[in-house]
Amino acid sequence: MLIEVLKSKIHRATVTEANLNYVGSITIDEELMEAAGILENEKVQVVNINNGERFETYVIKGERGSGTICLNGAAARLVQVGDKVIIMAYCLLTMEEYKTHMPKIVFVDDNNKIVKLSNKEEHSECLC
């Protein structure tokens, strides 16, 4: 049996751009992608903290160190520049793999610079 679990997460990133006329996807700063273990073209779920929207898209690599979080195509209608989002990737694991799995969680500041890396979240933890 396989179970789907959190692989990685970029927590409370700030949307820097929304480009409606692009084909689709989310552009993420390469540094954030590497820290979270998110791959180019990987499917991700995006949750908009400001309005509650949840949607899936795929990742395009953005300029390293730029802080870019850009929603492209139709997804651009679901965010506004300045919104806070959570970007999550998932993986399928066997029960044996699950026992040792540690997700990568990247906490960022308002400029999308890394402030904390973790492998777990505590209940009620808030880095607001």
Swiss-Prot record:
A family per Pfam: Asp_decarbox
Keyword Hydrolase among UniProt keywords: no
Pyruvic acid (Ser) PTM sites in chain numbering: S25
Active site: S25, Y58
Enzyme class: lyase
Transmembrane domains' residue ranges: none
Reaction(s) this enzyme catalyzes, per UniProt: L-aspartate + H(+) = beta-alanine + CO2
Keyword Lyase: yes
Subcellular locations according to the entry: Cytoplasm
Cofactors: pyruvate
Major location (coarse): cytoplasm
E.C. numbers: 4.1.1.11
Alphabetical list of PANTHER family matching this protein: ASPARTATE 1-DECARBOXYLASE
Assembly and binders: Heterooctamer of four alpha and four beta subunits.
Function of the molecule: Catalyzes the pyruvoyl-dependent decarboxylation of aspartate to produce beta-alanine.
UniProt name for this protein: Aspartate 1-decarboxylase
Organism: Caldicellulosiruptor saccharolyticus (strain ATCC 43494 / DSM 8903 / Tp8T 6331)
